[in-house]
Swiss-Prot record:
Keywords from the UniProt entry: Chloroplast, Electron transport, Membrane, Photosynthesis, Plastid, Thylakoid, Transmembrane, Transmembrane helix, Transport
Gene: petL
Single GO molecular function: electron transporter, transferring electrons within cytochrome b6/f complex of photosystem II activity
Assembly: The 4 large subunits of the cytochrome b6-f complex are cytochrome b6, subunit IV (17 kDa polypeptide, PetD), cytochrome f and the Rieske protein, while the 4 small subunits are PetG, PetL, PetM and PetN. The complex functions as a dimer.
Subcellular locations according to the entry: Plastid, Chloroplast thylakoid membrane
Function: Component of the cytochrome b6-f complex, which mediates electron transfer between photosystem II (PSII) and photosystem I (PSI), cyclic electron flow around PSI, and state transitions. PetL is important for photoautotrophic growth as well as for electron transfer efficiency and stability of the cytochrome b6-f complex.
Primary localization class, coarse: plastid
Pfam families recorded: PetL (PF05115)
Domain of life according to the entry: Eukaryota
Protein name per Swiss-Prot or TrEMBL: Cytochrome b6-f complex subunit 6
Annotated source species: Chloranthus spicatus (Chulantree)
Similarity annotation: Belongs to the PetL family.
Length: 31
């Protein structure tokens, strides 16, 4: 059970970082 929780937590963190990077890149391109 803890393994599944940590796995989902890792996926959540990875998706959050990826979306943040994509938003940052798009903002830089807009400027």
């Amino acid at each position: 059970m803890p393994t599944i929780t940590s796995y989902f937590g890792f996926l959540l963190a990875a998706s959050t970082i990826t979306s943040a990077l994509l938003i940052g890149l798009s903002k830089i391109r807009l400027i």
